[in-house]
Amino acid sequence: MLIDGKIVECEFEYTKCFSEFYENEDIIRFRDNQLIDMYYHNYTYIKKAMSKIELKSIIQDEISLRLSEKSKFCNILLSSDFNSSLMSTIKYNAEISTNGYYSFDISYFSRLNALSGCIIKKVNNEEMVDDILFCDLQHDEKNLGKDFCTRRCYRRGKVYVSDKGVNSYVCYHKGDIIGNCDLFMYNGIAKIEDFAVNPIYQRKGYGIIILKSLIDIAIKENSHTIYLVTDEDDTAKEMYKKIGFNKIGERADLFFQL
């Protein structure tokens, strides 16, 4: 299921807010020298369908480049149909995952029921970046470690408080930090990213109010397409579909541990 080119372009522009890039007719390659171990700030996107031989050549070249950079991983994304049998011919084993692209049906907006008493604030200072770190640690400290979560948050926080275009929002209820979410808008397309509700507040309706608030902002900014990307193995996609998101495409992510 191919992804609309305008959405792919929005994905690239989003990553450019964090990473330097190199581009040719086949690929676009991103590098974030401030966070070299962040998989989705440092990846290569294969832009078009190609033969098995061409694809293998590009994958091998990208792995070789990452090895020369002394990196411990190589992350390659592609939205064309992917034949997994190709992987048996490559020296390194890939962890293959499928990510789905889901677009919000704006006609569902009025049906989104939101809890009262919540405040959604745009991140515009370092103190609020610390609130995002609080959320990140609730979610990811166990799996990713405090050091990485802290470095990731402050790296991304630099962009949130800048004018680069990626905005982050924090949800509060009675002074408690409930969750956070990012919003990026480009040429009428809005990308929702890093949506998270702290574990103790999940399945209580807070997620819907966060999403509704960001969708409302996007609509008021004249976005005609509002989308998010989620792992197809993640149960969250069922919630997204229930509230008005429809699948419009998917991509394969090939992650090589080097």
Predicted regions and their residues:
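Conserved active-site alpha-helix within GNAT-family acetyltransferase domains
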Residues: 82-96, 208, 232-250
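N-terminal charged segments
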Residues: 1-69, 81-82
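Conserved GNAT acetyl-CoA-binding A-motif
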Residues: 69-79, 218-230
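A conserved beta-strand-loop-helix scaffold within acyl/acetyltransferase catalytic domains
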Residues: 149-196
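Conserved acetyl-CoA-binding loop-helix of GNAT-fold acetyltransferases
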Residues: 55-62, 194-197, 203-218, 242
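Acyl-donor-binding surface of acyltransferase catalytic domains
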Residues: 54-127, 254-256
